[in-house]
Amino acid sequence: MSKKITLLGSTGSIGTQSLDVIRAQGYEVYGLSAHSHVEKLLQQVEEFHPKYVCMTDLDAAAKLDAALAGRANAPKLLTGPEGLKELAALDGPDVVLNSVVGIAGLGASLCAIESGHDLALANKESLVTGGHLVTQAVEKHGVQLLPVDSEHSAIFQCLQDKESAKSLTKILLTASGGPFFGMKTEELRGKTKADALKHPNWNMGAKITIDSATLMNKGLELIEAVWLFGLPPEKIQIVVQRQSIVHSAVQYSDNSIIAQLGVPDMRIPIQYALTYPARVPGVVPELDFTTLKLLTFDVADEETFRCLAACKKAIKKGGLGPCAANGANEEAVKLFLEDKIGFLDIGRLVEAVVDSDSFGGDYTLADVYECDKMARAFVRAHL
């Protein structure tokens, strides 16, 4: 069955891997968006012929507009953050895949849902910062929320037996452990961005690779899992699986465990989200069990990797706590990538923001953006 896809964040790591899947399945691309990568987006326009494109950076949008001028069948250009939301809301696609990085993806997720589109969600920050708003909107508009993160896709796949899903008692959320697994605080003190960007298993963008090194990514995924699957955080166990073969598992009331395994390739969860509920042949090689000599499982070190501990505190506080943790982390990672703070400062700053307020209670979309600004300002004031 052919589908039309709007892909938000098409020039990033998840975006380009999504286009691999779309190409292999012969799906039609309805819309594409990028932040500032003009040349890459132009290449995608040449191949996939979308009806709409969006460039959120206005300087880059002007360059894209000039490059598209005079082209036959050029897509309509939308610009800025409002253009991204407009693209997400347009009638036409069967699925909107949101792979925008950071809180910038929240508004687009809500617009897609409120317009009645099924949402394939790689932008975990939508649920981390606005989980209450997103899940309410999904219920109100009767759309599918399809997880693209490999771990949440694995859990989603393990829960497809709806009767068994009623007996879910625990989620086993796996983590690779990142490049610094097993190291203690003193060993981490001098780690640079070059060290942190060397992920052992996954091909990802810079921000999520740093998040993997600090274990912030796993903290965000814990929060995401609470919203997606309805279990409290104490029922979600983080397990370090160094080989990234077991992508996550679920435990039922009879203590049986069902896991999803596969090679560490993001195109598997991307494809499942786009073809759901069907399973079809894809572009990823099969897992050869005879080559697996060892699968290891370890406890995540929250004492050393404070981002994970901070995220657990944040989700237990509720309300805007996770939003504050996310905003602090986005700002701290930006500063780390600019060589303005050290690796350990990321966890210190995220935890300090979470500890600075109670954060409880209901919230609006405006509250989310205000909390995000507050968290970023806190980080800059406490360097």
Predicted segments, located by residue:
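Catalytic, metal-anchored helix/loop core of enzyme active sites in primary metabolism
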Residues: 1-383
